[in-house]
């Protein structure tokens, strides 16, 4: 991979304890390393089989990454494949999806940060907000990607068969266009607490987009975590120990439903539900 990165930003401190940052950035990466994808491999296999027709069926294998069972002898004898105009093939055993240099990727966006600290008689408070916004996420097809794109543009591959991984990728398949993180902390003496919120924007799942353009939208998801700390000393050596009780996903938010393994989009979400932990640390 080779990439060109550009960023520009500024920092403001309008009042004591308040800092505001803003950064605009762009990344252009050539020969991006990634997976071609099982779906793309099977579509590419289909394209090669239709293009080959019934020529050299004894040696033709289609896309070698798509490993198939032997064709059903009954279907061959009944002439189904001959009627369809393709060489006989069986069901897919597995797809060997290895990492490749695929395409040129361009990503542009900006980040906003707000940091505020204030000391009061009730304790010390700190607020941290970071918002990330993506304006552009595009991938120009190369290699097999380019072949698939050309065939779909020519009508050889139906428009309602999704080809993933090139074109405008923003807002689809886990590529949400915004993410917000807010953290509020409090401390007074030996006690401390925090509230953290994480929100990821919505996106659509291309594999469930219908031929009339109707999108299957995966809604945004917001998760809150809560912690309470207590610091104390062991053998009179100062506050060298800390115990923390935490609640992860305090509102028990579940991941939005998606057409993926386990029923949610694991590249973007987790689905652990509300969970707890206790952490004990000692500095010697």
Annotate each language-model stretch with its function.
Residues 1-21, 95-110, 117, 173-178, ...:
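Outer-membrane beta-barrel signature, preferentially recognizing the C-terminal barrel domain
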Residues 12-14, 116-118, 186-188, 197, ...:
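Residue-level signature of outer-membrane beta-barrel architecture
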Residues 41-107, 144-174, 185, 283:
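Flexible glycine-rich, low-complexity coil/linker segments exposed to the extracellular/periplasmic environment
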Residues 3, 15, 107, 119-122, ...:
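Outer-membrane beta-barrel channels and translocator barrels
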Residues 8, 18-22, 112, 118-120, ...:
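Transmembrane beta-strands of outer-membrane beta-barrel proteins
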Residues 127-235, 260:
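C-terminal beta-barrel architecture of Gram-negative outer-membrane proteins
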Residues 19, 30, 135-138, 194-207, ...:
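C-terminal beta-signal and adjacent terminal beta-strands/loops
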Residues 16-17, 50-60, 64-69, 103-105, ...:
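Short loop/turn motifs that connect adjacent beta-strands in outer-membrane beta-barrel proteins
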């Amino acid at each position: 991979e080779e990439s060109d990165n550009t960023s520009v930003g500024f920092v403001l401190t309008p009042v004591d304890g308040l800092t505001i940052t803003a950064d605009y950035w762009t990344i252009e990466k050539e020969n991006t390393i990634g997976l071609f994808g099982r779906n793309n491999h099977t579509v590419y296999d289909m394209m090669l089989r239709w293009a080959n027709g019934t020529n050299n069926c004894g040696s033709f294998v289609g896309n070698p990454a798509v490993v198939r069972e032997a064709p059903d002898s009954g279907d061959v004898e009944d002439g189904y494949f001959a009627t369809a105009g393709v060489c006989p093939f069986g069901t897919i055993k597995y797809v060997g999806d290895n990492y490749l240099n695929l395409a040129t990727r361009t990503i542009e966006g900006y980040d906003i940060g707000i940091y505020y600290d204030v000391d009061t008689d009730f304790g010390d408070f700190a607020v941290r907000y970071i918002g990330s916004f993506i304006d552009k996420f595009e991938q120009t097809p190369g290699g097999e990607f380019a072949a698939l794109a050309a065939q779909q543009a020519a009508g050889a591959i139906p428009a309602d068969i999704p080809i993933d991984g090139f074109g405008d990728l923003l807002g689809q398949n886990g590529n949400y266009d915004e993410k917000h993180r807010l953290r509020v902390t409090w401390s007074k003496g030996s006690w401390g607490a925090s509230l953290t919120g994480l929100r990821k924007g919505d996106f659509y799942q291309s594999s469930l987009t219908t031929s009339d353009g109707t999108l299957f939208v995966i809604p945004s998801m917001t998760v809150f975590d809560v912690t309470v700390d207590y610091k104390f000393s062991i053998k009179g050596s100062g506050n060298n120990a800390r115990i923390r009780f935490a609640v992860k996903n305090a509102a028990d938010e579940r991941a939005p439903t998606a057409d993926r393994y386990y029923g949610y989009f694991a590249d973007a979400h987790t689905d652990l539900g509300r969970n707890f932990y206790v952490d004990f640390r000692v500095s010697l």
